[in-house]
């Protein structure tokens, strides 16, 4: 049967080949008969035949075939025979065994076709329904075979979906084009610097697995799945294959003999087997550390405060430009002068940005403070005062050689006689050098941010010491302030003991304007005392040291910074042991690491669970404090509501003003005692303890108006002389502790946050004691005292600057567990103590002079140079009291302070 079928197929192929040959031979004759007559037509036919023969020869030469040239119709016959052979006598490409490859087409006959069809491994021609799939699979597989094989001969013929009918020129063009593009097209080679397995390998493996599942009865052999042949110039590959071939995915040593295994097509992903993916290898779970917690807290604080500043619309450069425009509109300047002024402004802005970038980009000196100051353009000269938080230095702006030669920076005159420095060019400044470690241990991040923000806001104020520059290094913060050559007002009191009533009236009037300016900027000073009023070169007063100032902003609340750290520690499960006292308390009372009370109010659920969307708006609405509660300040000048821990407002500053006026007229504070505890008890019972001495001659010189204004200021806040605007706060203060977050009525035209109101000294100014004071022109009047120095570097008014003080700061039970000193800019020191802890350092009334002869009492002289014994300091944050973590946390928290002061 097989022989009969082979002979029948041979006869069928021969018949079809002869038919095609006859058609090819008769085409020129037909065209010659139909086209032209005579020898001219015959010549044209011969030319046409030669052109066709040359085209076919070039085509076949590109296909790698050698063309016989005998006879006129040999080329056409050979071409059509090759086409018939390709369409009828082709077997599919097999990926499961090695085939014998055909040689060149020269000498091919119909007997070869018959032998191929009689081959035992020959597969019948697939049906027309699967011809498209077979063609697509063959083309894909053949491309992969060519890219994988390094050197290979001509590839076995591919089964094409061509009909057995007579071919037309269009079909012939499609056939040749497809043959050239699929079999002998140009190869694309992708070169990678680091060759690796592609992501498509897994998909190819899944397809292979799907094929294996569909043919369970496949026979396996040890032969190679890729046909091998001799090298051919057409199929030679210069580099390793970059694509994945189907045969390369099969396991080594096992191949499939099913001829259709390489042609199965997966139409959709639904045919893929549903198998669970292998788990991805990951690094082992890492336990969170304190470094992670602190870094996260620092980033959160920075992002929230930074974007709050951006969204608030407070652009300093825009404000300066608006001020420039206002200046140009105010003065009648010519167009040339306007251009010159604008160019000068642009130059200043450019220089500022350049210096800012230099300070940001250059590495800071970790050990030398002089190196950092020099980098910022300042040269340290001498020390003005010392404090527990740092030191105040007199610095001079560095001059360049060009400025010195051109005379742009005139030098201050150096003389041997003292003179007033009014109108003389100032080239020196006072620079605060604050130690970060001390600030962090005392939890002063929020206070430092509040001080800097207020100084920036008060840059154009007449009554506030202006901030010139601020920068930092790894260990210190630097605030460059304007230099007040006259020293502080406390030094003036020490030198003169008691002031005459007219002089005291003038200075207290300027103090009122200073405090009122701070309230106009929505800030409660909370540390009003003689130390914080500085005397300028003209003799007028300016207020300074806003380290304890309160403005209600959530970013100026120390609890906000503490909560960021402790909440993360609680979520991550990091245990904080603290020191021995903390461990004892935790063991006895089972106290959590995070306290249940906060600095300025109770810890509510809203604080513990802030929203994820609209966080900044939520903080502005819910965490902006409308009343202050912290027990801060200097004990002798603290108001009774502050000592009691009740909610208070800006009226506490006017109480301190009454104490200062009393001290100016009598030489000592009204509630001075041997220790702070007794001082606070006297303030608490001020109605019984306040008295006005009359046994000295100077006491009789105090007028009744002065006594009345002092008595009106030293009252409970509901009856204190200030402004009627605060009356609405009295109802709020009678509510529970949550009133510090009371939502006020913003419809009030004078609303500023309820804790402070602008122009809140109307009742004080209208008192008869200040009759004759021109409040609008007082800054133009001649002051009672004008400092006389030999030059800007003369610091005679600061040599006596070690004044005793008992300043307190944030004695909340949730944060304060020990005694802390607080720094002030002129060398005074103060401690921070609990209200019920007795301490020494208050000044007795008997220590002050008993007469008006101007002699200095020996007790005051000894107090100026006395060094108070420092008690052992205990960090206020439990994390900083832990011996295992405090060093690491302290180093990381320095970055937080840097962000706050930059």
Curated annotation (Swiss-Prot):
Chemical reaction(s) catalysed: L-seryl-[protein] + ATP = O-phospho-L-seryl-[protein] + ADP + H(+); L-threonyl-[protein] + ATP = O-phospho-L-threonyl-[protein] + ADP + H(+)
Keyword Kinase: yes
Active site (record annotation): 527
EC top class, as a word: transferase
Stated family: Belongs to the protein kinase superfamily. STE Ser/Thr protein kinase family. COT1 subfamily.
Entry's EC annotation: 2.7.11.1
The keyword Lipid metabolism appears for this protein: no
Segments forming domain AGC-kinase C-terminal: 771-831
Bias (Acidic residues) ranges: 807-818
Region (Disordered): 1-22, 97-154, 207-288, 797-875
Identification of the protein by name: Serine/threonine-protein kinase cbk1
Signal peptide per UniProt: none
Single GO molecular function: protein serine/threonine kinase activity
Cross-referenced InterPro entries: AGC-kinase_C, Kinase-like_dom_sf, Prot_kinase_dom, Ser/Thr_kinase_AS, Ser_Thr_kinase_AGC
Function as written in the Swiss-Prot or TrEMBL entry: Protein kinase that seems to play a role in the regulation of cell morphogenesis and proliferation.
Protein residues bound to ATP: 384-392, 432
Organism the protein comes from: Emericella nidulans (strain FGSC A4 / ATCC 38163 / CBS 112.46 / NRRL 194 / M139)
Bias type Basic and acidic residues, positions: 97-118, 142-154, 210-221, 264-274, 797-806, 833-843
């Amino acid at each position: 049967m097989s022989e009969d079928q082979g002979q029948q197929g041979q006869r069928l192929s021969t018949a079809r080949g002869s038919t095609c040959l006859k058609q090819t031979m008769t085409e020129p004759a037909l065209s010659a008969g139909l086209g032209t007559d005579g020898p001219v037509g015959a010549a044209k036919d011969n030319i046409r035949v030669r052109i066709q023969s040359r085209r076919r020869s070039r085509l076949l030469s590109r296909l790698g075939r050698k063309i016989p040239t005998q006879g006129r119709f040999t080329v056409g016959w050979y071409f059509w025979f090759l086409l018939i052979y390709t369409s009828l006598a082709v077997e599919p490409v097999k990926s499961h065994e090695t085939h014998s490859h055909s040689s060149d087409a020269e000498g091919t006959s119909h007997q070869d076709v018959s032998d191929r069809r009689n081959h035992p491994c020959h597969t019948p021609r697939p049906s027309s329904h699967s011809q498209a799939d077979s063609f697509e699979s063959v083309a894909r597989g053949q491309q992969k075979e060519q890219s994988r094989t390094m050197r290979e001969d001509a590839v076995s013929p591919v089964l094409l979906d061509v009909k057995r009918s007579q071919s037309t020129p269009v079909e012939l063009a499609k056939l040749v084009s497809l043959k050239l593009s699929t079999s002998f097209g140009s190869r694309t080679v992708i070169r990678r610097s680091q060759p690796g397995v592609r992501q498509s390998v897994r998909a190819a493996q899944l397809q292979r697995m799907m094929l294996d599942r569909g043919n369970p009865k496949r026979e396996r052999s040890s032969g190679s799945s890729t046909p091998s042949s001799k090298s051919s110039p057409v199929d030679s590959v210069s580099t390793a294959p970059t694509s994945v071939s189907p045969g390369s995915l099969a396991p080594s040593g096992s191949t499939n003999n099913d001829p259709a295994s390489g042609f199965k097509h997966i139409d959709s992903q639904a045919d893929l087997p549903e198998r669970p993916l292998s788990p991805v290898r990951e690094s082992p779970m890492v336990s969170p550390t304190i470094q992670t917690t602190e870094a996260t807290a620092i980033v959160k604080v920075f992002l929230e405060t930074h974007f709050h500043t951006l969204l608030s619309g407070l652009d300093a450069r825009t404000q300066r430009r608006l001020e420039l425009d206002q200046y140009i509109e105010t003065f009648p300047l010519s167009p040339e002068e306007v251009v010159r002024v604008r160019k000068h402004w642009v130059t200043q802005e450019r220089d500022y940005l350049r210096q800012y970038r230099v300070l940001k980009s250059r590495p800071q000196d970790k050990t030398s403070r002089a190196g950092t100051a020099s980098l910022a353009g300042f040269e340290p000269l001498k020390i003005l005062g010392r404090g527990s938080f740092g030191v105040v230095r007199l610095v001079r702006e560095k001059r360049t050689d060009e400025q010195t030669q051109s005379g742009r920076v005139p030098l201050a005159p150096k003389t041997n006689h003292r003179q007033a420095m009014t109108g003389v060019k100032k080239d020196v400044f006072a620079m605060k050098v604050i130690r970060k470690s001390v600030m962090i241990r005392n939890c002063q991040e929020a206070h430092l941010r509040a001080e800097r923000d207020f100084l920036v806001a008060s840059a154009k104020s007449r009554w506030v010491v202006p901030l010139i520059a601020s920068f930092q290094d790894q260990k210190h913060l630097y605030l460059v302030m304007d230099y007040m050559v006259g020293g502080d007002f406390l030094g003036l009191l020490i030198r003169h003991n008691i002031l005459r009533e007219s002089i005291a009236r003038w200075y207290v009037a300027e103090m009122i304007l200073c405090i009122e300016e701070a309230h106009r900027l929505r800030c409660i000073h909370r540390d009003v005392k003689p130390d914080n009023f500085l005397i300028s070169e003209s003799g007028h007063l300016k207020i300074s040291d806003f380290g304890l100032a309160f403005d209600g902003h959530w970013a100026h609340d120390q609890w906000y910074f503490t909560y960021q750290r402790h909440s993360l520690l609680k979520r991550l499960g990091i245990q904080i042991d603290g020191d021995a006292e903390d461990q004892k308390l935790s063991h006895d009372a089972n106290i959590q690491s995070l306290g249940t009370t906060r600095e300025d109010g109770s810890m509510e659920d809203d604080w513990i669970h802030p929203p994820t969307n609209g966080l900044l708006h939520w903080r502005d609405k819910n965490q902006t404090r409308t009343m202050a509660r912290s027990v801060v300040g200097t004990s002798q000048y603290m108001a009774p509501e502050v000592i009691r821990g009740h909610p208070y407002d800006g009226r506490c500053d006017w109480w301190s003003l009454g104490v200062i006026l009393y001290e100016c007229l009598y030489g000592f504070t009204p509630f001075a005692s041997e220790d702070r505890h007794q001082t606070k008890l006297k303030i608490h019972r001020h109605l019984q303890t306040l008295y006005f001495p009359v046994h000295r001659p100077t006491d009789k010189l105090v007028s009744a108006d002065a006594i009345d204004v002092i008595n009106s200021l030293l009252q409970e806040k509901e009856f204190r002389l200030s402004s009627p605007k605060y009356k609405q706060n009295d109802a709020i203060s009678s509510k529970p502790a949550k009133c510090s977050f009371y939502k006020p009525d913003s419809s009030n035209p004078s609303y500023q946050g309820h804790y402070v109101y602008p122009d809140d000294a109307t009742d004080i100014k209208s008192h008869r004691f200040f009759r004759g004071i021109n409040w609008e022109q007082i800054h133009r009047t001649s002051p009672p005292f004008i400092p006389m120095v030999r030059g800007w570097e003369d610091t005679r008014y600061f040599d006596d600057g070690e004044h005793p003080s008992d300043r307190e700061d944030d004695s909340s039970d949730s944060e304060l567990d020990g005694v802390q000193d607080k720094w002030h800019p002129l060398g005074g020191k103060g401690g921070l103590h609990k209200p019920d802890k007795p301490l020494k350092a208050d000044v007795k009334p008997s220590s002050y002079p008993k007469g008006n002869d101007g002699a200095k009492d020996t007790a005051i002289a000894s107090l100026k140079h006395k060094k108070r014994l420092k008690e052992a300091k205990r960090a206020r944050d439990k994390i900083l009291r832990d011996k295992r973590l405090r060093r690491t946390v302290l180093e990381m928290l320095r970055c937080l302070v840097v962000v706050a002061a930059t």
